[in-house]
Curated annotation (Swiss-Prot):
Residues that, per the record, bind Mn(2+) 2: 296, 298
Residues that coordinate or bind Mn(2+) 4: 834, 836
Keywords: Amino-acid biosynthesis, Arginine biosynthesis, ATP-binding, Ligase, Magnesium, Manganese, Metal-binding, Nucleotide-binding, Pyrimidine biosynthesis, Repeat
Residues that, per the record, bind Mn(2+) 1: 284, 296
Catalytic activity: hydrogencarbonate + L-glutamine + 2 ATP + H2O = carbamoyl phosphate + L-glutamate + 2 ADP + phosphate + 2 H(+)
SUPFAM superfamilies: Carbamoyl phosphate synthetase, large subunit connection domain, Glutathione synthetase ATP-binding domain-like, Methylglyoxal synthase-like, PreATP-grasp domain
GO cellular component: cytoplasm
Taxonomy of the source species: Archaea, Methanobacteriati, Methanobacteriota, Stenosarchaea group, Methanomicrobia
Protein name in the entry: Carbamoyl phosphate synthase large chain
């Protein structure tokens, strides 16, 4: 069936900000779908609230709307754009939920929009837990015994019926949010209450436990002709009871018998046919000794399908988009081989391993247990010829300190950790094996298949041999084939990494590269996508063209999000436009940078010195770019420069800003001297190598001070310290100080306004992309603060000072490419806090706000163009207001305190655009799932220092018709200023207090700013309850003032502007002409 001619224009809904359970995989699938539809001549209208994505680039679709993913707003876009159809399954859970909501509102009927691909019925039959169970039973498939409940009373009845433990799964939620495993009746009621609040239709499924069964997934594809294929099957190393997004996964499945595989394959095809899903779909099974249960079906592109795409090279989202407009699998060409149709099932001749990356280094109080609800922020994937090689490369890719053999646990601890899955479980298994625990005992405690544990045991045994035996050339070849990195061999043999590497080269033991080609080398592949191993034949052919290698950003984690992948992709595009052959090395399966056709060659490898050098030795690029991949690639800059210098046989150089100059910016002492030389003020500061020294420095500067370790990303272990006792606690708990690793102590500028600048420098001119004014005060990590372009309250003098300092610093650091500078303004004086000569997390937001692609311009500057040649020297002047707001993951992390400070906690971001601050801020809050109420009750409990600023905001809220109430201190203070409101008890004064009111849905907004450590407990309980009961909350006084402005603007009855980002950019061009 050829493409439908009646579908000329299609609406795609993106997945919004990155959050736990929904990361970059939807940007990767969304941008693939956009390109796929445009190839077929279809007009694309895209809506997404997340500016840090490639899919929201103005050239990705015909019209790009960066607007809140809210049904009412999307209805307005439909009214304006009049699309013929909508594709729901590309935007993850968000896309599905909004499509279902729009269908229920009757929007599609009203405007004649067809749902393409998977029909709404199929979405209902998979997302509504009760309907799903009925559908499966009707086709004779087995599901766990279960009951759907809508109240706590019904939940109690289920215990009598099914016994404990029980698994709770809310309907229409993401990453298992709100669900969990209940081992007692109390846990059941607590999780059910949370789940009912999360579910869009207030429904929770309680099912019998299949804990400990194996979890297997099948990725299946179907077209309108009813042709079905299985793309990939994957096996979770962790058993049932751990969400698949939290589990280590291997593909293809390793422990299934051929009989089991055929049984599940047939079931998968039967299920996708029964549900009438068109496009890609993911089916999860619980399997035990030939018996199985269907756990769930995702009728959409998912995290697992992104993994399956990268594992097989089969572009699932691209094919799904073509099926949605009526094409069939035999008409679609496999874009990797360019010769076989998409109806050929992929074949693998390698093993992939995926391991999640968790944010527990940021949330020390959060519960680290892994359950059926997701907590990880990202993941890595590694490819090897054997499972051992694949596992060892995966560990190396995680970019965490806890490599094998570093952490030690004692016997009782080991048993507990094996029994209860945590993020450290795989490392614990290795440790248990080292201590001589048997495979059988570990398998019994963990319910992990003995096959996987025996493979880990092989690694442990090989380590013992490496420690005791001489490293002969034959033995070295054997351990390299197994996947041991040089750095680990150096640790085990007491040599240096360089010695191992040199010995390897002398003996001619070099990495070879194999190709991922979807067909186990049966057909010729046209898109080069490689992984390294130690075999004899190498499948990559080097060319004589000018080549540049770009280092990617690795797994998504707090502090290093999708923004750096965005910068990487832009750099690749810019260099390819210049005719330069561009290669990428990265290990994140969720991103656009690891898509098969982003670069000329993709190397799926760990981002460490050895693996980067392997690629350089084989391909001999002219240069390497390290400034686009965030801290991961910046950390490699200096060591890589040294290594390239040491290797006289290589002519590769590091391009862009010199690593020595990058280091100058990171090294506080050197940077301080440069600032003095340039005559630029900094907050008073110092550094300490002992506790005594720290107290002396802090006393000299005067409390409060900002303390942090040197060299960090996303402000790890950063704190504002108010007195000596607090400082002593920080020194004991947070950091280990030594002469090599001093701690930095700075004067904390209270109530200062923080400013961020992104710029490009070619060593002659400096292009300022934008000056951003932060809404939260200095002291909240810049990655967690909302910010606005253009600045709203800074004077012309301050802005001129900011521009002057930016130029001086960029030229003083000899920057070639991007630079981000953070400053603070207090009393009209500007201080420089820090400068980072690399890509920053605000680059995508700035590029979308002002309409110029900064990362692309930077890459062209590095390739040799001047800013004058490129025609970019003037700072753009937007006529609209753009606000970046962040998305915080507290609702997915029970126990973590939702308060902002100098340590970064957000996972993603959204953008609000309109013609004034009020409307833009309202949109940004709506997009960040923190809807500002226009009617109802507001609860205020504010620390003393913030009370003067509250008066004006409280007046505006009252004038807008909202009812105010608060704790005694706040009520009395406002009464002195003529604002009267009700008093509510503090939490520790007993009931009825604000938490009781939240439980009864009697509060519409919480404004609570944290005080000193002592009475924080009350505040913590209020803020935590706000998250758990889904009440919008604000924890800084500046955000409260901004919210009051936004509510005031909205109450004046002004409509929100609905315009595409393309239209806003066009207006800027017209004004400039």
């Amino acid at each position: 069936m050829p493409k439908r001619e009646d579908i000329k224009k299609v609406l795609l809904i993106g997945s919004g900000p990155i959050t736990i359970g929904q990361a970059a995989e939807f940007d990767f699938s969304g941008s693939q779908a956009c390109r796929s539809l445009k190839e077929e001549g279809v007009q694309v209208v895209l809506v997404n609230s997340n500016p840090a994505t490639i899919m929201t680039d103005p050239e990705m679709a015909d019209s790009v709307y960066i607007e809140p993913l809210d049904a009412r707003i999307i209805e307005k876009i439909i009214e304006k754009e009049r699309p013929d159809g909508i594709i729901a399954g590309i935007g993850g859970q968000t896309g599905l939920n909004i499509t279902s909501e729009l269908a229920e509102m009757g929007v599609f009927e009203k405007y004649g929009v067809q749902i393409l691909g998977t029909p709404v019925e199929a979405i209902k039959n998979t997302e509504d837990r009760e309907l799903f169970k009925e559908t499966m039973l009707s086709i004779g498939e087995k599901v766990p015994l279960s009951r759907a409940v809508h109240s706590l009373k019904e939940a109690e009845e289920v215990v009598e019926e099914l016994g404990l433990p029980l698994i709770i799964r809310p309907a229409y939620t993401l990453g298992g949010a709100g669900g969990g495993i209940a081992r007692t009746k109390e846990e059941l009621l607590e999780i059910t209450e949370r789940g009912l609040r999360r579910s869009r239709i207030n429904q929770v499924l309680i099912e019998e436990s299949v804990l400990g069964w194996a979890e297997v997934e099948y990725e299946v594809m179907r077209d309108a002709n009813d042709t079905c294929i299985v793309i990939c099957n994957m096996e979770n190393i962790d058993p049932m009871g751990v969400h698949t997004g939290e589990s280590a996964v291997v593909a293809p499945s390793q422990t299934l018998s051929d009989e089991e595989h055929q049984m599940l394959r047939s079931a998968s095809i039967k299920i996708i046919r029964a549900l009438k899903i068109e496009g890609g779909c993911n089916i999860q099974y619980a399997l035990k000794e030939g018996d199985y249960r269907i756990v769930e079906v995702n009728p959409r592109v998912s995290r697992s399908s992104a993994l399956a795409s990268k594992a097989t090279g089969y572009p699932i989202a691209r094919v799904t988009a073509k099926i949605a407009i009526g094409m069939t699998l035999d008409e679609i060409v496999n874009s990797v081989t360019k010769s076989t149709p998409a109806s050929f099932e992929p074949a693998l001749d390698y093993v992939i391993t995926k391991i999640p990356r968790w944010p527990f280094d940021k949330f020390t109080t959060a519960d680290k247990t892994l359950t059926t609800a997701m907590k990880s922020t990202g993941e890595i994937m590694a490819i090897g010829r054997t499972i051992e090689e694949s596992l060892l490369k995966a560990f190396k890719s995680l970019d965490i300190d806890n490599q094998l053999g570093i952490k030690r646990w004692d016997e009782p601890e080991i048993k507990t950790l094996l029994k209860t899955p945590t993020s450290e479980r795989l490392f614990v298994i290795f440790h248990a094996l080292e201590r001589g625990m048997s495979i059988k005992e570990i398998a019994e405690l963990t319910s992990i298949n003995p096959f996987f544990i025996s493979k880990m045991k092989k690694i442990v045994e090989m380590e013992k041999c490496i420690r005791t035996e001489e490293l002969t050339p034959e033995f070295l070849r054997e351990v390299k084939r197994m996947g041991f990195p040089d750095s680990r061999l150096a640790e085990l043999t007491g040599k240096t990494r360089e010695q191992i590497s040199d010995f390897r080269h002398e003996e001619g033991i070099l990495a070879t590269f194999k190709m991922v080609d979807t067909c186990a080398a049966e057909f010729e592949a046209a898109t080069p996508y490689y992984y390294s191993t130690y075999e004899d034949t190498c499948e990559t052919n080097s060319t004589d063209k000018k080549k540049i290698l770009i280092l990617g950003a690795g797994p998504i984690r707090i502090g290093q999000g999708i923004e750096f992948d965005y910068c990487t992709v832009h750099a690749v595009t810019a260099l390819r436009e210049e005719g330069i052959e561009t290669h990428i090395i990265n290990n994140n399966p969720e991103t656009v940078s690891t898509d098969f056709d982003t670069s000329d060659k993709l190397f799926f490898e760990p981002l460490t010195m050895e693996y980067v050098m392997n690629v350089i030795e084989r391909e001999r690029p002219d240069g390497v770019l390290v400034q686009f991949g965030g801290q991961t690639s910046v950390n490699l800059a200096l060591p890589l420069k040294k290594e390239l210098k040491r290797r006289t046989d290589l002519n590769t150089v590091i391009l862009g800003t010199d690593p020595e100059d990058m280091d100058l910016a990171e090294d506080r002492e050197k940077f301080y001297l440069l600032m003095q030389e340039l005559g630029i003020p900094q907050p008073e500061g110092g550094y300490a190598t002992s506790q005594q020294e720290a107290i002396e420095v802090a006393k000299r500067i005067g409390f409060p001070v900002l303390v942090r370790p040197s060299y960090v990303l996303g402000g790890r272990a950063m704190e504002i310290v108010y007195d000596e006792i607090d400082l002593e606690r920080y020194m004991k708990e947070a950091v280990r100080v030594s002469p090599e690793h001093p701690i930095l102590i700075d004067d904390f500028l209270e109530a200062a306004c923080e400013i961020d600048v992104d710029a490009v420098c070619d060593q002659i001119d400096v292009l300022i992309g934008a000056i951003m004014e932060h809404i939260e005060e200095a002291g909240v990590h810049s990655g967690d603060s909302a910010c606005v372009i253009p600045p709203q309250s800074l004077s012309k003098e301050v802005l001129d000072q900011v521009r002057d300092y930016t130029r001086k610093i960029a030229l003083g650091l000899r920057v070639k490419g991007l630079i981000n500078i953070q400053m603070a303004e207090k009393g009209g004086k500007v201080f420089v806090l820090e400068a980072n000569p690399r890509s920053s997390r605000t680059i995508p937001f700035v590029s979308k706000a002002v309409g110029i692609p900064l990362a692309k311009i930077a890459a062209k500057v590095i390739a040799g163009h001047s800013l004058k040649d490129l025609g970019y020297t003037d700072e753009p002047k937007p006529k609209h207001v753009s606000i970046k707001e962040v998305l915080l993951p507290f609702d997915k992390l029970p126990g973590a305190d939702p308060v902002l400070g100098p340590e970064m906690k957000s996972t993603g971001e959204v953008m609000g655009v309109d013609y004034d601050f009020g409307r833009a801020y309202y949109k940004a809050e709506l997009a960040a799932d923190n809807l500002l109420p226009l009617t109802g009750k507001v609860f205020l409990s504010i620390r003393n220092a913030d009370k003067p600023e509250l008066v004006e905001a409280a007046r505006k809220l009252q004038a807008a018709g909202l009812e105010l109430m608060g704790t005694r201190g706040t009520v009395n203070y406002l009464a002195q200023h003529g604002i009267f409101m009700d008093t509510v008890k503090k939490v520790h004064d007993g009931s009825p207090n604000v938490i009781d009111m939240m439980r009864r849905d009697e509060v519409d907004l919480i404004i609570n700013t944290p005080t000193s450590k002592m009475s924080r407990k009350d505040g913590y309980r209020i803020r935590r309850a706000a998250v758990d009961f889904k009440v919008p909350y604000i924890t800084t006084i500046q955000a409260a003032v901004a919210a009051a402005d936004a509510i005031e603007t909205m109450k004046k009855g002004q409509d929100l502007t609905i315009k595409s980002i393309n239209e806003y950019h066009k207006e800027m061009e017209q004004k400039e002409e």
